[in-house]
Amino acid sequence: MVHSISKEELLKAGCLHAGKLDEAFALYRSAIISANNESDMLVFIRRLYSENKGAVFADFYYPVLDAQSQERFRACLDGPQLKMAEAFQASDGQVYYPLKEEWMLDFLVMATARNWLFSTFYFADKKAMLWGNYDLKFPIFCDNE
């Protein structure tokens, strides 16, 4: 099981955060990361993961969606992917998760890149936030320092 953490715990870990995309653009330096395909984007995000080992988080809303929205998402998944989705448990409606294993990252990048369910990725060590996905264009936000 993967247990969620609160927004306060995410911030305490040192992550950047914004409630909306326009807020992120106003608060932080930004760039757009583009990829030709899902595999290329995964390679880039895995690099960020390795440079922030132990300090990577993501939001994942599946556990708090209504039953109909959960069913639509499950319809996109095969058996192993469904088990991955079900591993994420939301405590008290919290949707932030520490990504302690690479399979968690890979699963969330895949779901985001395929437009099934979007996640934002938070990197505490290098202070970056990657917002996905707009036709394989991911806005990335960095601390202004």
Regions found by a protein language model. Name each.
Residues 1-137, 141-145:
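Structured alpha/beta or helical-core interaction and ligand-binding surfaces enriched in interleaved
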